Amino acid sequence: MKKQDEKTEMLEVTIQQKKIFIRQRDIYFLESMGRVVSIYCKNGVFKVYSRLGELEEKLDSDMFLRCNQSYIVNILWVSDIVDYDFYMPGDRLVPIRKRDKKEIIQKFYNKRNETDTHREKIH
């Protein structure tokens, strides 16, 4: 995973042989089903033929967290954590891998604190 800079704030994906760019801050979460990844964001849902791991490498590692085999969440959009789920916009629940729950939640709070600290320095 790479760190965010001005050149990587957009995620480049190919949909029906056309390259499109999605602002990473606008992505809520990514969901993988086989070789199709659904990217849920402010502008709707984009379906991409790819592996989740390939897209994960292009995402800002400070902003995104892999919470199980099939999902990556944008920590900026997590509104709550209840039991084994992240609550996302649109009342969507993203499951947290049960055996790694403590570690994943700790990573979430660490990333969230780093992001908040970085935001305070900018403003």
Task: List each language-model region with its residue ranges.
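Inter-domain helical "communication" segments and dimerization helices
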Residues: 1-10, 103, 107-123
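An exposure/low-complexity boundary signal
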Residues: 85-114
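Conserved binding/recognition cores within well-folded domains
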Residues: 1-89, 93
